[in-house]
């Protein structure tokens, strides 16, 4: 039987952590790639898709690792491969390839803006500590700093960490060439002339074999019985060499690095602005789904208050650090309760021409929304606007 030569042709396949949707045209191949691990299931792409080609999967179960399935599903035949979802994904979980090359024709033709990612580290303030890389939930910190023995057995010696110079002096008028300094330090050498019967006086010199290995520990100074040794160390810079940078495409602007930086060296603008509220009376106790799936660790279980401080109020099962929240909406999507979380986005930090398509999508994304009833089967979940919730 003859093979079909009709175009376009569509395919969808799983390749490791990626799901690849493909559209083959006569002369061009478009591919939309979803990184399953990076996708938070926030639903921005679901709402933004002009073709309504993206639907929710089992977001809570997928994000908790209970099932090995993507949090969203893309219909490869309905998808127009326009790239709008790529432009609006705060997690860079989606990418578009044209003939194997990662591109965004809709941006190239000024048909849609992109996120204006401004996060940066002031190198003059940065002391090259490890706090930002340790707290970043998105692994967006590129730390290109030499490794030393404190962090790894194979690391460089600690005395090489800072640019410095060490001066070693021996007052030969005081020195008796006893050699104790050379006994305790491998970098010091005693050169004595062989004494003869004509004179029992010792003569010679004390030298340092390798100046670069001296870490100015001053053991030789303290152990010298004649106080003949002086060691002076001059530090040229008290900063570690190397660079610590934020990788813009990976940064989700949660501000963890910014709020924990002891030198206040980090600045950034949130990708998404807005407000989010959790209503304790609607939140089911013992659930913790939103806490487990939050990509920024902004949601947490609050400490229990004494009954005397509750004043008749219901104890909250979950709390949110609004500084760390990026208003992605993943918690709203995954919440199995009704109206427990309300998200009100007010804007997206973008650069580029704000086209009619963009304005239409923004109107939808900035409509206040609340948590859905529950999730059961893929495609069954949906977000509700606040207005719909009140009318129900």
Regions found by a protein language model. Give the residues of each.
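Flanking helices and flexible, charged tails adjoining ferredoxin-like Fe-S electron-transfer domains
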Residues: 1-30, 38, 62-81, 86-392
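Short, contiguous, helix-prone interaction/anchoring segments in small proteins
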Residues: 39, 43-48, 52-57
């Amino acid at each position: 039987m003859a093979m079909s030569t009709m175009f376009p042709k569509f395919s969808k396949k799983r390749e490791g952590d990626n799901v690849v949707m493909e559209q083959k045209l006569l002369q061009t191949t478009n591919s939309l790639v979803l990184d399953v691990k990076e996708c938070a299931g926030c639903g921005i792409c679901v709402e933004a898709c002009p073709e309504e080609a993206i639907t929710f999967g089992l977001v809570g179960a997928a994000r908790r690792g209970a099932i090995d399935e993507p949090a969203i599903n893309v219909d490869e035949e309905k998808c127009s491969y326009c790239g709008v979802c790529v432009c609006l994904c705060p997690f860079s979980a989606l990418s578009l390839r044209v003939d194997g090359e990662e591109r965004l024709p809709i941006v190239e033709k000024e048909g849609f803006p992109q996120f204006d990612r401004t996060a940066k580290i002031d190198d003059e303030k940065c002391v090259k500590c490890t706090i930002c890389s340790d707290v970043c939930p998105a692994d967006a910190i590129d730390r290109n700093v030499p490794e030393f023995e404190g962090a790894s057995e194979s690391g460089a010696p600690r005395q090489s960490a800072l640019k410095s110079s060490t001066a070693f002096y021996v007052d030969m008028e005081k020195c008796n060439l006893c050699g104790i300094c050379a006994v305790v330090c491998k970098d010091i050498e005693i050169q004595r002339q062989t004494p003869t019967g004509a004179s029992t006086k010792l003569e010679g010199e004390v030298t340092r074999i390798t100046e670069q290995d001296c870490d100015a520990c001053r053991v030789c100074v303290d152990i010298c019985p004649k106080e003949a040794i002086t060691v002076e160390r001059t530090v040229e810079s008290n900063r570690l060499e190397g660079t610590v940078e934020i990788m813009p495409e990976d940064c989700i602007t949660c501000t963890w690095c910014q709020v924990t930086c002891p030198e206040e060296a980090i600045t950034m603008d949130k990708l998404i602005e807005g407000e989010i509220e959790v209503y304790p009376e609607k939140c089911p106790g013992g659930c913790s789904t939103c806490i487990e799936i939050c990509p920024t660790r902004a949601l947490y279980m609050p400490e229990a208050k004494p009954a005397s401080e509750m004043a008749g109020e219901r104890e909250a099962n979950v709390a949110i650090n609004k500084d760390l929240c990026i208003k992605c909406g993943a918690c709203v999507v995954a919440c199995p309760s009704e109206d427990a979380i309300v998200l009100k986005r007010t804007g997206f930090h973008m650069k580029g021409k704000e086209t009619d398509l963009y304005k239409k999508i923004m109107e939808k994304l900035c409509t206040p929304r609340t948590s859905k009833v529950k999730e059961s089967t893929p495609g069954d979940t949906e977000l509700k606007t606040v207005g719909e919730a009140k009318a129900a």
